[in-house]
From Swiss-Prot:
Gene for this chain: pgk
UniProt protein name: Phosphoglycerate kinase
InterPro entries: Phosphoglycerate_kinase, Phosphoglycerate_kinase_CS, Phosphoglycerate_kinase_N, Phosphoglycerate_kinase_sf
GO biological process: gluconeogenesis; glycolytic process
Keyword Mitochondrion: no
Enzyme Commission numbers on file: 2.7.2.3
Length: 397
């Protein structure tokens, strides 16, 4: 998917309207608890400033449901950006309207302003053409650098592109397309995918799409128990999607047909309840006790999975191996994270597909030891399912 990027156009003296993803977590005093999304947008932002463009940033934050709500103001993000850049960032009091337009027109080369939360207007998520046109009127160039919302056809990601002559990808989106695209279309082999998470239903399309691409799939997380039940194994009290058992059987058959090795755990860590002080033990998957729930992959599985990962040239990871939020059920997830870091050291391309896996690798302190951590949860998932992302499809080729 070749899209024009910031590097392909001249920015000097131009009003550049950039969609970023500043949907950052805030504490009750409205302090930002994690600024990685703002930091991630810095290369694109700096490029516009250095080239003398006039930068207008827009984003959403949280779910204000189409109403103005000061708790969801982007002011803390503008303040943090100003600190990171070491220069002022003007904060607008809305994202459309005459007053905002006057501020936009007053911008000088190399200056930056931040529009207020797009989702204070219901028209944003409705992809309303008039709202999109009004946003577009503020800029001469549109840049989308918000991969996290690229799977949504909203006014600021899709609608706006109909009303600007130039619509290009920012560096963050370019990097996402490069790594996720390479993984899907041009991977060095062996190519191993690790899929975790609670439910098969959330990962069916990814599994089916990856069967045409990968050599091996390692499965973890609670979704393994639906596979085990499909194979007639005891699952105790583990989470099972009973309405997906037929599907699990067909996925196992499909993997066989396509010559993909679908590897399931051989042992699991079980406990009677999901709590930090529950007594846990390791059991083979052939004899999971009644009343016990599987909450992580066991040591023998960790060893097998680590070996598979270390033998790979390309690794894609999406979804944790267990309830990693609780330390005693986090060993499997952290061991996979460590194996990915070791594989990267050995020259493999390692890609973390956003969402919980990104949180897990950050918790393990290994985010900078892998090739690429995707910034989009739902967007990475849809990309890995082979779906077209409207926010990217709409950009200039």
């Amino acid at each position: 998917m070749q899209k024009k990027t910031l590097s392909d156009i001249s920015l000097q003296g131009k009003r550049v309207l950039m969609r970023v993803d500043f949907n950052v977590p805030l504490d009750q005093d409205r302090n930002i608890t994690d600024d990685k999304r703002i930091v991630g947008a810095l290369p694109s932002i700096r490029k516009v400033i250095e080239e003398g463009g006039r930068l207008i940033l827009m984003s959403h934050l949280g779910r204000p449901k189409g109403k103005v709500n000061p708790a969801f103001s982007l002011a803390p993000a503008a303040k943090r950006l100003s600190e990171l850049l070491g220069m002022p960032v003007t904060m607008a009091n809305d994202c459309i309207g005459t007053e905002v337009m006057q501020e936009v027109l007053a911008l000088q080369d190399g200056e930056v302003m931040m529009l207020e939360n797009l989702r204070f207007h219901p028209e944003e998520e409705a992809n309303d053409p008039d709202f999109a046109r009004e946003l577009a009127s503020m800029g001469e160039i549109y840049v989308n650098d918000a991969f996290g919302t690229a799977h949504r056809a909203h006014a600021s990601t899709e609608g706006i592109t109909h009303y600007v002559p130039t619509a290009v990808a920012g560096y963050l989106i370019e990097k996402e397309l490069r790594y996720l695209g390479t993984a899907l279309n041009d991977a060095k082999r062996p190519f191993v995918a690790i899929l975790g998470g609670a439910k098969i239903s959330g990962k069916i399309d990814v599994l089916e799409h990856l069967f045409d691409k990968v050599d091996t799939v390692l499965v973890g997380g609670a979704m393994v128990f639906t596979f085990f039940k499909a194979q007639g194994l005891p699952v105790g009290n583990s989470l099972v999607e009973d309405n997906k058992i037929e599907l699990a059987i067909s996925l196992l058959e499909k993997a066989k047909e396509k010559g993909v090795r679908l590897i399931l755990p051989e042992d699991v860590v079980v406990a009677a309840e999901i709590s930090a002080d529950a007594a846990s033990r390791v059991e083979p998957v052939t004899t999971i006790s009644d009343g016990m729930s599987g909450l992580d992959i066991g040591p023998a599985t960790i060893e097998t999975y680590a070996k598979e990962i270390l033998g790979a040239k390309t690794v894609l990871w999406n979804g944790p191996m267990g309830v990693f939020e609780i330390d005693q059920f986090a060993k499997g997830t952290f061991a996979v994270a460590q194996a990915l870091a070791d594989a990267t050291d050995a020259g493999a391309i390692t890609i973390i597909g956003g969402g919980d896996s990104a949180a897990a690798i950050a918790k393990a302190g290994l985010s900078d030891k892998v090739t690429h951590v995707s910034t989009g949860g739902g967007a990475s998932l849809e990309f890995l399912e082979g779906k077209e992302l409207p926010g990217i499809a709409a950009l200039n080729d």
